[in-house]
Each structure stands twice: as C-alpha cells, then as structure tokens.
C-alpha cells in the first residue's frame, strides 16, 4: 500500500484472476472494509490498482460511497462481535466457527 501525502491518496495494488469480476471479488475479500478503515485512518481517498494475473491488464478502481458504507457496516458488525465476546463476555462463539476432525 502507498500513502501519497501530496496527492492525498492511498493506492493499494492488488492482483486478480479476472479483472472483469474484481468488483464482486472486492466485496468477497472485504476490500470495502479495508477501504473504509484506511479512509478513516488517513482521511484520504483510496484507489485500487489491479493487475490481471493472466492477461496483465491493468484496472483502476475508486471507491463509491456505497462501497465505503458497506465497509463501514462490516466493521461495525466486527466491533460489535468483539465487544460481545471480549468486553461484555456474552457472545456465542459457536456461530462463528466449525470444529471437525480431518
């Protein structure tokens, strides 16, 4: 990740198997949460520069308000889960993991 103070911009370099599906992958891999946290920490916009692993095509993806709001919602849920487990001591861990023998 690069923080460009003169341009007030955070640049995150990512790779993908398919640049045409990067937008959905960004939600799947919680890049919306990352973008929200970084934008709050540094008070700067964030862009993703994406390289397709197969074609080497480049993509530049900025973050919409909707994308950042999605990240904010996910972060709020994570904070609530943390508080439930570690602050309040009343969380139910069983909903967050699976335990099996291989």
Predicted regions and their residues:
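Conserved catalytic cores of phosphodiester-cleaving nucleases, focusing on short active-site segments
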Residues: 1-23, 38
């Amino acid at each position: 990740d690069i923080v460009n103070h003169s341009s007030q911009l955070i640049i995150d370099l990512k790779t993908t198997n398919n640049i045409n599906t990067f937008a959905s992958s960004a939600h799947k891999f919680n890049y919306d949460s990352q973008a929200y946290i970084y934008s709050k920490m540094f008070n700067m916009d964030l862009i993703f520069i994406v390289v397709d692993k197969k074609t080497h095509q480049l993509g530049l993806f900025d973050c919409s308000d909707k994308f950042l709001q999605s990240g904010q919602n996910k972060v709020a849920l994570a904070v609530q889960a943390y508080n439930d487990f570690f602050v309040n001591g009343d969380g139910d861990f069983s909903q967050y993991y699976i335990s099996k023998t291989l």
